[in-house]
Amino acid sequence: MSRRNTAVKRSISSDPVYNSQLIHMMISHILKEGKKALAYRLMYDAMKRIEKTTQQDPILVVERAVRNATPTIEVKARRMGGSIYQVPLEVKPERGTALALRWILLAARNRTGRDMVAKLSNELMDASNRIGNAVRKRDEMHRMAEANKAFAHIRV
């Protein structure tokens, strides 16, 4: 562990259109090779598509999707006595949100088709309805933590 000063947490700015920190975090996760304008366009087009399809506020759909994909428990590998145990740990809210955003984007990128706007909007709508690969990944992580509950006493 480093003995130097700990890094100061930076505050997350809000995006200019929806004034939401969550949308800004999503745009930052979409970002590839520094093309921020493209990331903004992808996210805003996906939001318009969600609004057109569901007739609901797109921010509420995105927030519900992230909430449904956010894990509460994760497992961490810990080596003890020559064997490796999967130790269940609680997830901090910031990490949970970051994992949910990462999984939603990964699931959207792995969908078939070429149109990223359609893939992202469909994954967000699926996650808000508690289906889709991002929610499945969260459930899988919870199942692994439940299966390894016996090792919860081990310190990480």
Curated annotation (Swiss-Prot):
Any matching Pfam family: Ribosomal_S7
Any GO BP annotation: translation
Keyword Ribosomal protein: yes
Any one GO cellular component localisation term in the record: chloroplast
InterPro entries in the record: Ribosomal_uS7, Ribosomal_uS7_bac/org-type, Ribosomal_uS7_CS, Ribosomal_uS7_dom, Ribosomal_uS7_dom_sf
Cited PROSITE patterns: RIBOSOMAL_S7
Principal location: plastid
Superkingdom of source: Eukaryota
Subcellular location: Plastid, Chloroplast
CDD domains xref list: uS7_Chloroplast
Keywords: Chloroplast, Plastid, Ribonucleoprotein, Ribosomal protein, RNA-binding, rRNA-binding
GO MF term set: rRNA binding; structural constituent of ribosome
Similarity remark: Belongs to the universal ribosomal protein uS7 family.
Function (record text): One of the primary rRNA binding proteins, it binds directly to 16S rRNA where it nucleates assembly of the head domain of the 30S subunit.
Complex and partners: Part of the 30S ribosomal subunit.
Designated name of the protein: Small ribosomal subunit protein uS7c
